[in-house]
Amino acid sequence: MDRYDYIIIGAGSAGCVLANRLSEDADKTVLLLEAGGKDGSLMIKMPAGVGGLIGKKGPQNWGFWTEPEPNLEGRRLWWPRGKGWGGSSSINGMVYIRGHARDYDQWRQMGLGGWGYADVLPYFKRSESLEGGGDAWHGAEGPLKVSKASSPNPIYSATIEAGGQAGYPLTKDFNGFQQEGFGPYQLTIHDGQRWSAARGYLHPVLARPNLTCLTGVRTTRILIEDGRATGVEIYDEKTKAKRVIQANAEVLLSAGAVQSPHILQLSGIGDPDELDAHGIKVVHALKGVGANLQDHVDVCMSWECPKPITAYSLRKGLVKTLGIGLAYMLFGKGLGRQQFLESGAFLRSRPDLDRPDLQIHTVLAIMQDHGKVQVAKDGFTFHVCQLRPESRGRVGLKSADPLDDPAIFANYLAAEEDRRALREGVRMMRKVAAQSALAPYITAEFAPGKDVQTDAEIDAWIRRSAETIYHPVGTCRMGTSGDRMAVVDAECRVQGIAGLRVVDASVMPTLVGGNTNAPTIMIAEKISDVIRGKAALPADDAPVYGDGLKAA
């Protein structure tokens, strides 16, 4: 069959949601296209497999590199992106974070009706099944299973206690009443298994007769006739053949913040200057395609630990490593059930800010270069991440060849405020590490090291060592009708093209304060109702800490 009502490009966090919800209508045919394969790998299922997935190019990882970064000593940065069913939800760190309520109220204030916190909270709740049951902020019956941090490792509780000793708030639920403070993470893990968007949304509906899923196919362009998307051209990686598939109703582009703009550009939709430079005929001029790229930049501060309780000792040697895999594969038991990242914090680098601008992830290992460098010492890391970048980058073309990687210009730390916030984050986490609660677990600061003290020294270390923490958004951003740089409207329809929507992290107008998997799933849940002509879920005014409300 070469004609479907809906064609979804990309089986990632958003595409899996759309495939599930749109195929609920038995009279509609749905085609889900995925360039990668299925998600049957043990490394995907096993939470401890995350390190082996995120650090190298392979069947589950596109493994992109940025162009040289001018503010990071001209380095090209590693950009892992998920490939295959589940997309990046199949290779990420499994941290379930929605962002701050004011992130979404900011979208509404930008003129994007229906995107305030009260509007999106019902869709977060609909998607979620929180271990132990729901409450005012959490769902209990959704496809996405979410658990609470459960590791008994004392470093997690010690970092939270040290945060309190340093004078920072504590919180029990980053996704509830109060985001700010130190506390435990919630995780997309269920019964010791990764719970990706594919696991939650796609697998349960694979038997539906109106849903067709193709893997190993690259979408080379979207077909436009008389101002309407009529279908797609795909390339089969096995047969090396191209074919055209028609869409009766809509084409839904859910290829992510890197590849959604790239596919639009290959289709002749984008900035005419960019298209002309690569000999691509302009089908529809839309200057904002690929612009407005935002991402969370991150540095890894690490401390050596005198106790053999971190990933190095727990996995040291071939026998232990094989034992972890075998115990998990045969019995579903042991360290394979953990992703070694269960506590963290959301903090403000200045007291005048209305919400946190720093996020901390505590990892039970000395992290260097996305875990590619194995440090033969026990230790732990504070990932220090700047949440609200003022810097903007872009995604462009390297060539007109649809099989070429896109060109990624992240443009990290171009703004002084971004540099100031990250520098302050380094100082704040040193203050936390100096507290008595962490004293039994620290012998020395591994990185940046005691010789890095002045602003200039910290800035130089950041330029040498900063990396992505994998949250790119904004390259097909949502906006109002008068916004020349907006790519889609508040219903994710591509401006000026009928029958075409972008539904993924690329539509976020501003980067939310936290990990981006849960917000991407929420966006797809919300837009699936729009596509189906269903009324939006009623707004939900759950209380959130702010002016006039007392902190927890």
Short names for language-model regions:
Residues 1-552:
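N-terminal redox-cofactor-binding region of secreted/periplasmic oxidoreductases
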